[in-house]
Amino acid sequence: MKQDSRFPNLFILDHPLIQHKLTHMRDKDTSTRTFRELLREITLLMGYEITRNLPITTKRVETPLVEIDAPVIAGKKLAIVPVLRAGVGMSDGLLDLIPSARVGHIGVYRADDHRPVEYLVRLPDLEDRIFILCDPMVATGYSAVHAVDVLKRRNVPAANIMFVALVAAPEGVQVFQDAHPDVKLFVASLDSHLNEHAYIVPGLGDAGDRLFGTKN
């Protein structure tokens, strides 16, 4: 895991397996089925990295030989909240890692001015819960900012929110940092820039279309 000095709340997950799978996802000739499988796999690997600092306590358990105080996650409950629609493809990988997590959904689409328009919010109970927001792309950053806004408006502490994406553009990361400097943003790659259509370059195309086999 590494950081970029420009963005204090950005964490780049540079594990070799993550980078290997991301390269195959970028390939325009990768099939929908393979893209979907890779997204699930890479999200599981990223989930392992982002949860390494969860608080730990101990629980008394009895093994076949003795009783011991064994480590368990302390108190906090976990929720996975994909940003629709492409974020849905990331939730399965996280659920493979954390099968007991609750799942919410935040639905937004990008208007002509690239601003997010909310059409759905469904969340589990908020008390004492850590939220993992996920969306494959942070392009303009507006949808990511909006998703965090949804939680903060419901009094979820910033310390209980993290955002996970595959690729991000510096422009979007700056927007996210300006709005939510207290929320950690985890990505597999910080790419070069946004083009005139607000697509990430080099990016991986439209993640939703590639995930579901649709055309924009």
Swiss-Prot record:
5-phospho-alpha-D-ribose 1-diphosphate binds at R85, R110, D135, P136, M137, V138, A139, T140, G141, Y142, S143, D206. PANTHER family: ADENINE PHOSPHORIBOSYLTRANSFERASE, URACIL PHOSPHORIBOSYLTRANSFERASE, CHLOROPLASTIC. Keywords: Allosteric enzyme, Glycosyltransferase, GTP-binding, Magnesium, Nucleotide-binding, Transferase. NCBIfam families: PRK00129.1, upp. Uracil binds at I200, G205, D206, A207. GO terms for biological process: UMP salvage; uracil salvage. Binds 1 Mg(2+) ion per subunit. The magnesium is bound as Mg-PRPP. This is Uracil phosphoribosyltransferase. Allosterically activated by GTP. One of its GO terms (molecular function) is magnesium ion binding. Pathway: Pyrimidine metabolism; UMP biosynthesis via salvage pathway; UMP from uracil: step 1/1. Belongs to the UPRTase family. The keyword Glycosyltransferase applies. The keyword Glycosyltransferase applies. Catalyzes the conversion of uracil and 5-phospho-alpha-D-ribose 1-diphosphate (PRPP) to UMP and diphosphate. Its cofactor is Mg(2+). It catalyses: UMP + diphosphate = 5-phospho-alpha-D-ribose 1-diphosphate + uracil. InterPro entries: PRibTrfase_dom, PRTase-like, Upp_B, UPRTase/APRTase, Ura_phspho_trans. Pfam families: UPRTase. Its EC number is 2.4.2.9.
